[in-house]
Structure formats: structure tokens, C-alpha cells
Amino acid sequence: MKWPIRGVYFFFEPGENRAKTSEPRVVRIGTHALKFNSKTTLWNRLRQHRGYADQRGNHRGSIFRCHIGTAIINKEKLQDKFPDWKKRSASREVRQKETLMEKRVSNHIGKMPFLFLSVNDANGPSKRSYIEKNSIALLSNFGKIKTSSAVDPPSEDWLGHHCSNENVRLSGLWNHNHVQHEKVHPEFLNTLEKTITQAG
């Protein structure tokens, strides 16, 4: 399989389905290389999230991994075993102690199917960032999860309910940017449809 250099990805999660169908609901949207000097490819970004062949990973290089880890830690009350998980940097000794949790995070994300949309535009602010931002705004249930206006809310057993990040808990997505009451651009769905058609 030939991977596109750049694109937008959509993760799903076992047990998380849309409200009125049995179809899986999107739980995370993301892209990469939003800075002009970035050389990160779509495949490299997905590998950062999913971890390596031996299931190790680096949650300090992936906010997605960090969110999953905090949720597992909070759910199982493991804060004393992983007190440095949310810190931006850590010694080699600390990272070695976190190996077990990194593997658990890799195992969880490894079970999550995903789709990607090829958008081979230039690095920096781009159509990819436009699609990412509007997709998140469209699917976010920030502040609506337990109301009648919620659209495809998370299940009661969703791991994200235990995440330390409030935006994750209140939106029903493993995202923290663009989830709070942002408006969807009126031409977004037309743009998304055209991009999907162009990608083949």
C-alpha cells in the first residue's frame, strides 16, 4: 500500500457506535505538518500515535497517547505508579518505569480502526487544517453529551470519560482543540465531499 505524504485521519473505537445505527462513531480527528518547517508525514504521525512493533511508544510526542494514558490511569487509580505521565519531559529512569503503560496505550490504540483522507497540500495552515477543524466542530458534543441535542454521544462505558482533559470528557472526542462551540463553515461539507471525490 502506498501512503499519501499528507492527509487527515479519523479514528474509531470498539464499542463506540452512532446513536441511531450500528455504525462506528468517529472518536478522534487529526492531521500533521501544520508548521511550515515540519517534515512529518501522515504515516509517521499515525505511527507516533499507535506506537511501534514492540508496543512501546512516546506519549510525550503524541497528545492522543497522553489522553488515552491519563484515562487508563484515572480509571484504574494508578496515579501513584505513574506520577509523571502528564509532564512534558522525563528522565530515562521515569520513561522506563512508564513502559508498561506505554504498551497498554499502544494496545488500546492498536485496536482502533481508522480511515484517512489524502490531502497532499503544502506544509502549514492548509486544507488539511480546515478539514480537521471543521470535522471536530461538527462531531463535538461539548457540553451536550447528556442532553437531547447531543449527536452520536459516547457510550456510558467510553474510556474517555476518565480522561484528565476536560475538553475530551465534555466533547466525546479524543481531541482538545476546536471542540468548544466552534461554528462549522457553511461550505465545509461540500469541500469535504469534493476532496473525497478527488482522492478517489
Report residues per predicted region.
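GIY-YIG nuclease catalytic motif and its immediate N-terminal context
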Residues: 1-104, 108-200
